[in-house]
């Protein structure tokens, strides 16, 4: 059985600690992937987790989702996240069983599996999630008729129907064109701004962090450097970690 992260009773509002790591060590099999990692994620922050493949971004997500126990140190979640329905997760892609006649409504309502939501509340939840994902009025449409970008929006809606305090996205805009990518980020930015949702977004795309992020985490060489985007995206910090400088806002890296 995987040990759950420690639960804290302190901090729940915008700016208070939702996730705290103290000298955290994470393993993938026998290999130590991340070591001596410390950071604090405050409520209402928009984080971008950046780094090459194999540097520990997905391993960190697994720990945050309770799928991987720390090999050392401490990972503490606020008590409001102890109910896993308070955490929404958006994967890179999802392939429902093609035999099923899946409507957008049926697909999005899968996000309520395991959540304690009264039947009378579900229609309002669905309407809210579709509106925030830019899919209003499409609930009766077939999932299979959606474009790639619309399917990613449906994945976002499926996570949002839980009304999560923490939304985690694992490279959800990979393989999407620039305009679709930007539209999805605009959806997330509005959610962050209007609802105060804390967002963790894993990506290789430095330009997204430059434009949208309040905080970033840089993964490199078994370490994670975390802090405000204005500090970590300075050329000298990026040069030290990756030998690169950030693009200007709006320039795709």
Which residues are covered by each model-predicted region?
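H-loop (His-switch) and adjacent beta-strand-loop-beta switch element
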Residues: 216-229
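Helix-to-loop junction immediately C-terminal to a conserved catalytic motif
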Residues: 65
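Conserved catalytic motifs of ABC-family nucleotide-binding domains
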Residues: 163
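Catalytic Walker B motif of ABC-type/P-loop ATPase nucleotide-binding domains
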Residues: 167-171
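H-loop/switch region of ABC-family ATPase nucleotide-binding domains
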Residues: 203-204
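Conserved ABC ATPase "signature" region
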Residues: 121-138
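Conserved ABC ATPase signature
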Residues: 142-146, 150
